[in-house]
Amino acid sequence: MTKETKKTTKTASAYQPTLQKLYQEKVLPALLKEMGVKSPMAAPKLEKIVINIGVKEAREDIKALDIAKDDLTAIAGQASQVRRAKKSISNFKLREGMPIGVRVTLRGARMFEFMERFINIACPRIRDFQGFNPSFDGRGNLNLGIKEHYIFPEIDVEKSPKAYGMNITFVTSAKNDKDGTLLMQYMGMPFKKSAK
């Protein structure tokens, strides 16, 4: 290994997304103080982000699935997977093994990069946006529904003629909704202001 190769390896591994730095430098100490715990391991942290797009047109038109897959890959910065039906449902004309959507799971640096783009770029592009309802699942995980994936600047409207809805799940290590809400607020998630 030459000296230049060693230098590039060091700088590549030293890269840290802005939101990850913010978590370590400001959010974590604030959480420890507010929760009254001393160990950083006891504080909640973001573990992964799961993004899912359901494509009902995939039954008749496989191109719709390819478009959704390409769009989700562009949004997430990581290859997406095709999700298939686990069982047959005759009312929906669905057979086991049919493609029904695409999904991607983000961890590490990509997770923080996506969350930063989502909060700072995509959310302000939502029409009449007043903030999200804090819809947690009882175990500190936040679920958000997005009506149009066009809010992401990576999507080309010419190549993607149909607007797809998305489900985004922020999986945290929080034990309850109160701790999960606290973590997401400190990370900058825009929640609706409660009417007092």
Residue ranges and their predicted role:
Residues M1-K196:
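Ribosome-associated RNA-binding proteins
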